[in-house]
Structures are given as C-alpha cells and as structure tokens.
Amino acid sequence: MAVGVEPGKTAYNPLYIFGDSGLGKTHLAQAIGMDIKQRHPELQVLYVSMNKFQAQYTTAVLNKEPNDFINFYQMVDVLIIDDIQELSGNKGSTQNAFFNIFNHLHLSGKQLILTSDKRPSELSDINDRLLTRFKWGLAAELTQPDYETKVKIIHNKARSLDGAENIPEEVVAYFAENINGNVREIEG
C-alpha cells in the first residue's frame, strides 16, 4: 500500500516480490502499478518482463542504439520488471544496462518493483552489485494460500462463473482441503 501512495519515497525501494510459480506475483505487481497510476496519473508506470527487456536491449544494440534504450527506461517513474531471474547468465552488457537504469531510477527517487521465483540470495549468474541492490528495499515472499484463503478464492471464482455462485459449502471445503497447489490450480 505504501508503494502505491508514495512510489519511490518509502523504504520499499526496490520492492522485490518472490515466490513459487502461480502464486500471483505478476498479478500483484501489475495491481500495484495500476494503483500507482490511479493515485498518480501524472507518473509514467512501465511494466515489462525481463525476457522482453533483454530482447529490446539486443535489438537496440544491433541497431547501434543502446543509449536510446537506456534513456527510454531512465525516463519512467515506476519500473516493474517481471521475472528478474531471467537476467541470470546474461553477464555483460545487458546486466550493465540494467545496472545503469536501476541506479539512475533509484537515485532519482523513482520506484522499482521486481518479481522473481527466487529470493535475491538464490539468484545465480547475476553481478553481485545488482544482487546487493535487489536487497536494498523490501523482499516480500508470496506463499501457498492457507485453507481460508483457498475458500475465498473458490467462492470468488464461483461468483465469476454463470450459475456456479451457489456452490455447496461441502464442495468448497472439499476443494480447499484437497487442492495443494497454487492459485492457478485452485482457479482451474
């Protein structure tokens, strides 16, 4: 909530959201971005996956425009990077470009939001200077939903389906007790 109210002005910069696949990291990061945009319509909020970031950077290098690429990203007020772990193994220019963008935004009081399926300490093949920066703010772990949360998810999903809003509580309880997976598995 604090990130949405005062992006870049809290101790939660960067906000590093991590957890297993299917727990809602991307959804949460996008929701935070939308909240920021609603509260601060004047701010430039950019969401991009790390794979897309890398593809764009590669194209910029091939076109001899890496500085234009970096300048573009340095102009945003809120940068949301999904699946930051995909930066692993890309030693060299892509990590250097991201390092420069990260530093510029952070020093300028801009908000960074990163998602990953790993804790910062579990990332491999990423420069130490980047890993250190990932730990500057708040690392928030998303975990498997508990029973009560599963029940709420099932009820919400049922309400979104025609004719399924009156699902018997015994059925809801059965699913909540027997589905051990992530939110995607609960929603079907």
Feature locations, PLM:
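Conserved AAA+ ATPase "SRH/arginine-finger" region at the nucleotide-binding site
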Residues: 122-124, 137-149
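Short glycine-rich substrate-engagement loop in P-loop NTPases that contacts/grips substrate
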Residues: 42-76, 92
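Short regulatory helix/loop adjacent to the ATP-binding pocket of P-loop NTPases
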Residues: 58-62, 120-136
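Short conserved motifs of the RecA-like P-loop NTPase core
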Residues: 165-178
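Walker A/P-loop nucleotide-binding motif
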Residues: 8-29
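Structural recognition of the conserved hydrophobic beta-strand(s) that form the central parallel beta-sheet
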Residues: 47-48, 80-82, 111-117
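The conserved phosphate-sensing helix
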Residues: 179-188
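Post-Walker A helix-loop "phosphate-sensing" segment adjacent to the P-loop in P-loop NTPases
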Residues: 6-9, 34-45
